[in-house]
């Protein structure tokens, strides 16, 4: 079973908002209590948060499908539904969030860094919130909206100061084990290291993090060996260290050719954070060369022979032995000085006043176009019309009538008439297709009344206040009867 996972694909689904409640207040001696249905609760959101105690994406490897709780339904007595709890997913420091197209959505660095992966759906309004002068006791409520549903790729890029690169069995894991308290797997065969190993190196009163990545071989860019994918863990490293095996017996290999081969593979790697990292490209990172295994006499002689040639590249060269621990102390202090110099060379972050710029959403706009798949039909697109469709309970005639009133006030009906829509033609809004029937001809003033009634044709025997005043004046002889 894998214990270290640095790349996973997750499917996150936010909670659905609770439905609104259609309720009428019932109380003794109050025959007209009015609507008292509460609103539905908001669905829970899916949030990624950095936790320093988490070091791998292993949990998401076994449980990639994640869903936040739904909001609860509103109830009578003006009781709103409870909001769904947010689902907070703990991720390691250095996690990069990418979408389906490979675009970076967030780079989570630092304890407590957060990213809203999927927003919860809004709750539906109860009939108390829908009451108006024309519709005093609505017999319907709005449905809750579904939460966002996304597929995200999480990549872990280790946060370290020094990255060790080299051929397999060059002694990288051994170097980490003797410089820190880390206990990586060490064996006398290549590709012993399959996952990055981190260790904290102490230099006097200072300390830094060192990362050991699996070995590189020529042709890794084409997939040989373990490939180049694990090099994502050195993208954040301020200093790169070439660990060279001076005691290798493989034909055709020497320290200089090994360094050239490593540089060639590093140049072919395309960092994901190249445009976003303040450290710049990998080719611009400070480098050091560690000539390892000088406890072997032949290796010590070879190290002395190539030191001058390697130094001409402008990189510091160190002769060390992880077995006898010779040369380790000067190496650690030199690496710390390189880290300090690299940090000082970084551009100072400009402290600017945080400005929140929400993504503009045109909720008032909509478009009406001919339906290419249904001759004679039309398609209505817009944030508000499509949301209203999702919130409507089509089993309730009054709710459907309320939807028609909202679309008419928005101007959808007039736009359909301008495009030559005929009564009975198919109109698609969101996932719903229905036969369109205009409420009134275009240009006619609409008399506002409750759904299901028409003040222009409905007659009532109820005597109004104006009629009672007129009758009282006639009885008193103040006016002549009509």
Curated annotation (Swiss-Prot):
Residue intervals of the Obg domain: 2-159
Main localization of the protein described in the UniProt heading: cytoplasm
Binding annotation for Mg(2+): 173, 193
Matching PROSITE patterns: G_OBG, GTP1_OBG, OBG, OCT
Compartment annotation: Cytoplasm
Chain intervals for the UniProt region annotation (Disordered): 441-482
Biased composition (Basic and acidic residues): 453-469
Cofactor annotation: Mg(2+)
UniProt xrefs under Pfam families: DUF1967, GTP1_OBG, MMR_HSR1
Coiled coil spans: none
Gene Ontology CC: cytoplasm
InterPro entries: G_OBG, GTP-bd, GTP-bd_Obg/CgtA, GTP-bd_prot_GTP1/OBG_C_sf, GTP1-OBG_CS, GTP1_OBG_dom, GTP1_OBG_dom_sf, OBG_GTPase
Keywords associated with the record: Cytoplasm, GTP-binding, Hydrolase, Magnesium, Metal-binding, Nucleotide-binding
Domain OCT: 358-438
Family to which this protein belongs: Belongs to the TRAFAC class OBG-HflX-like GTPase superfamily. OBG GTPase family.
Functional description taken from the UniProt entry: An essential GTPase which binds GTP, GDP and possibly (p)ppGpp with moderate affinity, with high nucleotide exchange rates and a fairly low GTP hydrolysis rate. Plays a role in control of the cell cycle, stress response, ribosome biogenesis and in those bacteria that undergo differentiation, in morphogenesis control.
NCBIfam families noted in UniProt: Obg_CgtA (TIGR02729), Obg_CgtA_exten (TIGR03595), PRK12296.1 (NF008954), PRK12297.1 (NF008955), PRK12299.1 (NF008956)
Complex and partners: Monomer.
Alphabetized PANTHER family for the sequence: DEVELOPMENTALLY REGULATED GTP-BINDING PROTEIN-RELATED (PTHR11702), MITOCHONDRIAL RIBOSOME-ASSOCIATED GTPASE 2 (PTHR11702:SF31)
Protein name, as recorded: GTPase Obg
Organism from which the protein derives: Mycobacteroides abscessus (strain ATCC 19977 / DSM 44196 / CCUG 20993 / CIP 104536 / JCM 13569 / NCTC 13031 / TMC 1543 / L948)
